[in-house]
């Protein structure tokens, strides 16, 4: 199966030679924009973007690998102090597949004077998002901002190992935008045609430019909502998909699926024929196992552990230059390959074990929901394995670096997988895991001192999707960076806290939970009131902001996965102190959400337990926001419950 990417790889070098460097000059500023006093699109807007332009080109990096470059240019007008505060620190997020380069910024004051951002003032940091997940950003502080000022900045995003064949062009930001402009050069490859799918917007026809680029533009774009636990941004913001496909491809749903599944099946069938070495490995892996599920887990582990990955962010440079295997047998012989080679080896092992296994194609729920999938290969970019188990299917991702037995990450659960079998392709919804699978377990053993200081040890275990998610975000960081990120997170919640003996355990031992542990000293954790101390037993919830604090909701609700939490806290009181008897917080049963706290005291020891679970992954209407907010608000109040610790004997 020859893809357009394969055909275009040699052409990317030519494109790089023909592409000129981005102009270093700033774009001309219309006097009307400098004198603009009121927002144009949203009367309540604190700031609006006057222009957001993105130029998309292809290039080749120093290792000969194709890259796609997005040259961004953003100019925004500040109208109020709230807008000034919103732009005080500007963050540009990126991940392991993206490099941020050539970042420049400046402020134009209302009187026309210009204040540049110094390169030395641009830095990289990590910010914490929902669920303790951390994101890397390039940051800078915008200088001399005030109402009436304009902030403009430009940067390049290099997307590694990429050719601009399947583009997702976003047309909205977190503030209204007067004009959005995308400039791209359509690729000319015989036998392929460009296809476009617009979403959530009324887009005018593309306009060809004199320099060979094509302009896609949209004016007066409303701000996109930025709310916690929202669906993927592509589900509600205006965007356009630009892709390419064979000119002979049919675009009716069923005909597309048959043709696409046939290509996928034939590709993997050719590369996953077992040889003697594969048969021997399969026999060893499933020896003594009887159930299909156990065999699948064992074969997935065998495929993952026998091949050293060559394309991951943690792979050494020499591994990335290793020979590319042509099939499963060659991959096993080399002992190395890509994630796709791991999948191919698994399919060969399954065949050797007389299991009925097929490749399956899907898309991440972190990107797009099934309702927005269109009949194009780019909407089925991910490859999994489907193994028949009676009248059901077991779906695994053998190449999952963060699961010992090939369990699928959360973002494939509830997605529709297209199983490419011999005849008619099968559409199958990947089942969700229960809340008990993804457990966050926190254990704390603390001593309360007479002055209100709390000190002791904490251990947090992350299982299931928690463990996979945090391993994935942390594996590219050094041990020192992991420690710093944990220290920063906890000191933000507990100001003045002193952490020591920080340990990050089981990064590579996937058979065990991912663990963070540390010793901590928190001055002033309990507040003194005369001879009494006011103490919050829910130590791990202190300083945590309420989830769903906003009174209103714009976007639908989207929960990545069902999860549970279990806290066990032991606090030893100062000598001569005891806890006054009082009613503790009550359990909460909200159907899919359960919360069970308990507080008890025995002599000088307080025991606190907290169990919480939420069993509602997927997308839910905004009408459910009220009950959900009530649940989280009640839980937050219960977490903040305090007890009175009184001196019972003289010091």
List the model feature ranges, each with a label.
Residues 1-6:
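Positively charged n-region of N-terminal signal peptides that target proteins for export
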Residues 8-18:
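Bacterial N-terminal signal peptides
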Residues 22-651:
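A sensor for short, sequence-defined functional sites
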């Amino acid at each position: 199966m020859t893809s357009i990417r394969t055909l275009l790889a040699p052409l990317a070098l030519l494109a790089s030679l023909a592409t000129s460097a981005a102009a270093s000059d700033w774009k001309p500023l219309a006097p009307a924009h400098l004198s603009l006093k009121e927002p144009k699109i949203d009367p309540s807007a604190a700031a609006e973007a006057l222009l957001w332009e993105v130029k998309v080109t292809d290039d080749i990096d120093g290792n000969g690998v194709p890259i796609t470059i997005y040259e961004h240019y953003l100019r925004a007008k500040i109208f109020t102090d709230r807008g000034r505060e919103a732009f005080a620190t500007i963050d540009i997020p990126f991940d392991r597949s993206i490099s941020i380069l050539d970042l420049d910024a400046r402020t134009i004051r209302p009187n026309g004077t210009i204040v540049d951002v110094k390169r030395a003032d641009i830095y990289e940091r990590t910010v914490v998002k929902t669920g303790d997940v951390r994101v890397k950003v390039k940051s800078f502080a915008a200088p001399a901002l005030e109402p009436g000022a304009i902030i403009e900045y430009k940067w390049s995003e290099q997307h590694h190992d990429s050719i601009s064949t399947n583009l997702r062009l976003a047309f909205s930001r977190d503030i209204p935008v007067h004009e959005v402009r995308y400039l791209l050069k359509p690729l000319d490859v015989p036998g392929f045609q460009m296809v476009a799918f617009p979403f959530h917007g009324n887009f005018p026809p593309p306009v060809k430019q004199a320099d060979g680029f094509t302009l896609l533009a949209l004016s007066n774009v409303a701000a996109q909502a930025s709310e916690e636990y929202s669906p993927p941004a592509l589900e509600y913001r205006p965007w356009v998909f630009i892709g390419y496909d064979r000119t002979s491809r049919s675009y009716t749903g069923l005909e597309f699926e048959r043709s696409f599944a046939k290509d996928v099946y034939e590709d993997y069938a050719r590369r996953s024929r077992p040889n003697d070495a594969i048969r021997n490995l399969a026999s060893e892996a499933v020896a003594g196992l009887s159930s299909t599920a156990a065999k699948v887990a064992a074969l997935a582990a065998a495929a993952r552990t026998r091949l050293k990955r060559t394309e991951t962010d943690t792979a050494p440079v020499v591994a990335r230059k290793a020979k590319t295997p042509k099939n499963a047998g060659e991959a096993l012989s080399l002992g190395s390959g890509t994630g796709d080679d791991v999948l191919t080896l698994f399919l060969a092992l399954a065949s050797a074990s007389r299991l009925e296994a097929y490749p399956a194609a899907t898309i991440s729920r972190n990107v797009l929901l099934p309702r927005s999938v269109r009949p194009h290969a780019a909407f089925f970019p991910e490859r999994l394995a489907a193994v028949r188990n009676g009248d059901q299917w077991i779906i695994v991702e053998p190449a999952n670096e963060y699961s010992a037995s090939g369990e699928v990450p959360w973002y494939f659960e509830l997605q529709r997988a297209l199983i490419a079998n011999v005849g008619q392709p099968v559409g199958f919804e990947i089942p969700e895991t229960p809340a008990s699978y993804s457990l966050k377990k926190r254990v704390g053993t603390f001593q309360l001192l007479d002055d209100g200081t709390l000190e002791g040890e904490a251990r947090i275990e992350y299982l299931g999707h928690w463990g996979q998610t945090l391993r994935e975000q942390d594996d590219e960081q050094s041990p020192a960076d992991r420690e710093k990120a944990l220290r920063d997170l906890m000191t933000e919640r507990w100001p003045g806290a002193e952490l020591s003996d920080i340990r990050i355990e089981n990064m590579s031992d996937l058979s065990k939970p991912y663990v963070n542990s540390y010793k901590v000293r928190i001055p002033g954790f309990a507040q003194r009131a005369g001879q009494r101390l006011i103490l919050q037993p829910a130590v791990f919830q202190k300083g945590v902001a309420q989830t769903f604090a906003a009174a209103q909701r714009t976007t639908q609700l989207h929960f990545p996965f069902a999860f549970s939490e279990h806290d066990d806290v032991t606090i030893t009181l100062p000598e001569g102190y005891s806890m006054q008897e009082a009613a503790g917080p009550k359990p909460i049963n909200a159907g899919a959400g359960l919360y069970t706290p308990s507080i008890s005291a025995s002599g000088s020891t307080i025991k606190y337990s907290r169990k919480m679970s939420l069993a509602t992954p997927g997308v839910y209407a905004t009408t459910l926001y009220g009950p959900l907010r009530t649940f989280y608000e009640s839980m937050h109040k219960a977490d903040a419950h305090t007890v009175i610790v009184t001196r019972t004997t003289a010091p």
